[in-house]
Amino acid sequence: MSKQTLVLLYGGRSAEREVSVLSAESVMRAVNYDKFLVKTYFITQMGQFIKTQQFSEKPSESERLMTNETIELTQKIKPSDIYEEGAVVFPVLHGPMGEDGSIQGFLEVLRMPYIGTNVMSSSIAMDKITTKRVLESIGIPQVAYTVYIDGQDLEACLVETLARLTFPIFVKPANMGSSVGISKAQTKVELRKAIQLALTYDSRVLIEQGVIAREIEVGLLGNDKVKSTLPGEVIKDVDFYDYQAKYVDNKITMAIPADVDQSIVTEMRSYAEVAFKALGGCGLSRCDFFLTQDGQVYLNELNTMPGFTQWSMYPLLWENMGLAYPDLIEELVTLAQEIFDQRESHLI
């Protein structure tokens, strides 16, 4: 039986490129090589496409994907050279130029099936501000927030924010994931600095009310018929769950499934599925919730390309549901082909 080609795109232009490499390496080890041939392409910080490795069998634990330190410029290709008839693309890319609809639009122009949400849902979900406004419109609870856009009156924003929110306050770039650029502010001075830091990553800044809450996550899988997982909990040994804690210091553990009341489980899974459909989701996503001590549930964000490292919540959530990592990848490929066929049928 001939193998199907699975194209892995990794790296990318965003500050989350290191997470992308870790995720892609986990995917390349989890693939069922009885069914798939894996071809990998590294996208540099400057947006160049580099042809890297090809795997017909499971690589050793010591083998690493090529990155800036190991690639050769002679391997540079035109982006369109990744095209291969019958191949499915897994864009294991996080953040801007990865989850924001850019690479999805490129792959649609190439007429290649790809894993993950489409152009519209990717771009909406990537923007935390737009996502909040969509979710508010369908009645899904959100923590209180204000917005700052680069060029506006910063002092006026600070006055509005302090009139509506109380410390601690969290400040986030609107279009960034993996907790990149997020700060916790306890004073007006810290709030101003946090906004200025967020502006180095994006021109749109989300300013959120801090809440004392557990962080609970639900995995989603499907196209028209979406399935959700039992929730898992991020248990932190740090003040807040930032990039350093997630990927460098590894100061987190996970409880899967989370120890929460059944009524809360039902509420979270329902909110997750409704949010996924409202944003036009397909393929996969992960919904991140806050659960306060008094039982209030807030949907924090919907992540359209969650981390796929060996310690990432999304694949572990599905393993808890009985879907092993290799089978999860196979299901994602099937969903990608299904949505591609559906999209193509509408263009003929």
Swiss-Prot record:
Q: Which GO terms describe its molecular function?
A: ATP binding; D-alanine-D-alanine ligase activity; metal ion binding
User: Where is it mainly found?
Assistant: cytoplasm
Annotated positions binding Mg(2+) 1: 288, 301
Q: Which UniProt keywords apply?
A: ATP-binding, Cell shape, Cell wall biogenesis/degradation, Cytoplasm, Ligase, Magnesium, Manganese, Metal-binding, Nucleotide-binding, Peptidoglycan synthesis
Q: Which cofactor does it need?
A: Mg(2+); Mn(2+)
Could you say which residues bind Mg(2+) 2 here? 301, 303
- What EC number(s) has UniProt assigned to this enzyme? 6.3.2.4
Enzyme superclass (EC)? ligase
Q: Which reaction does it catalyse?
A: 2 D-alanine + ATP = D-alanyl-D-alanine + ADP + phosphate + H(+)
Compartments annotated for it: namely: Cytoplasm
Keyword ATP-binding present in the record's keywords: the answer is yes
One Gene Ontology cellular component term attached to this UniProt record is:
cytosol
Which ranges carry the ATP-grasp domain? 132-334
Q: How is the cofactor bound?
A: Binds 2 magnesium or manganese ions per subunit.
Q: Where does ATP bind?
A: 162-217
**Gene Ontology BP terms:** cell wall organization; peptidoglycan biosynthetic process; regulation of cell shape
Keyword Electron transport listed? The answer is: no
InterPro entries listed in its UniProt record = ATP-grasp (IPR011761), ATP_grasp_subdomain_1 (IPR013815), D-Ala_lig_Van_CS (IPR000291), D_ala_D_ala (IPR005905), Dala_Dala_lig_C (IPR011095), Dala_Dala_lig_N (IPR011127), PreATP-grasp_dom_sf (IPR016185)
Pathway field of the UniProt record reads: Cell wall biogenesis; peptidoglycan biosynthesis
What Pfam families does this protein map onto? Answer: Dala_Dala_lig_C, Dala_Dala_lig_N
The record ties this protein, via NCBIfam families, to: D_ala_D_alaTIGR (TIGR01205), PRK01966.1-4 (NF002528), PRK01966.1-5 (NF002529)
Main role? Answer: Cell wall formation.
Which family does this protein fall into?
A: Belongs to the D-alanine--D-alanine ligase family.
Q: What is this protein called?
A: D-alanine--D-alanine ligase
Question: To which species is this protein native?
Answer: Streptococcus pyogenes serotype M4 (strain MGAS10750)
Upper lineage: Bacteria, Bacillati, Bacillota, Bacilli, Lactobacillales
